[in-house]
């Protein structure tokens, strides 16, 4: 175990600490660290988040991550971290193959849990996690899955407008999530390209986000899907040494890609709305292009993650001469989360979604309520991903979502 650093357990007198232990320190570990480090400094929280311990298998690398991101101590075994008395919450930022084991152990040990998306690699794993979370809730524990795009103020505002009936009955939902970091066939075979670690490819990495976002905005789960998936490059250079999932050094050998590179599917909501989804890591020139549009009887909303401080809104009840999409700049104190940030017109970024995620989780713990999204929500997304894979394997046959 690394030597503890000096860290206050309260930025304000009288607030009890929420001592966080995090497993994983790469891309998502850095993002979650930012959230825990900042939430209590920006928002008036009922508990004070304390970065107690960070865990990873490489002692030197995890020590460097602790120094860089403000963690007080380190562990190289997540089991030892869970057993510590100075950990109240376990934050899981590892590849999907370890989510279930860590989360189940943490819940059994009486800890609160935050788990990165997708919740697990299989429906069976996700179901066991959701059941354990429900049982833990009866003991006063909280378990949340990290779909951070719910925490963009603009998407939270969109959800508010849909719930208020501003769009009327929904007819269409269109969602795309496009990246291009796998276009080069010489990109190495990192863990994100291995089914045994990642569970799926673009479907779980990107598709999980847009399935959750669509269901969150519409307010109901998908009923069924018809899907296509494809793996464009089936063999890649093997990496040398450790990988982050997004980068590595290549060796002379090659290995098999065992996940999808792209997924396309159409879907139905129980209310009758039709939806289309596209997730790919082969959209040349697109770095992180998540876009969603909802069309209803009375209006439409559109959101673009690359312009994440804006919503486009069309009100079909306006006079024809004045009709059309207009921009809503989501930076006002009345918008979700923004009363604690900057004056109107000063935008936020990707990293702020993790601050908002930490804020919401702290409130759920303090209030003893189920967080959103819950492990049950994560299980629902996992069922959609499984139905997409089943449909694609059966030549795109319409596949109902299991409940």
Protein language model regions, located:
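N-terminal Rossmann-like dinucleotide-binding module
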Residues: 2-69
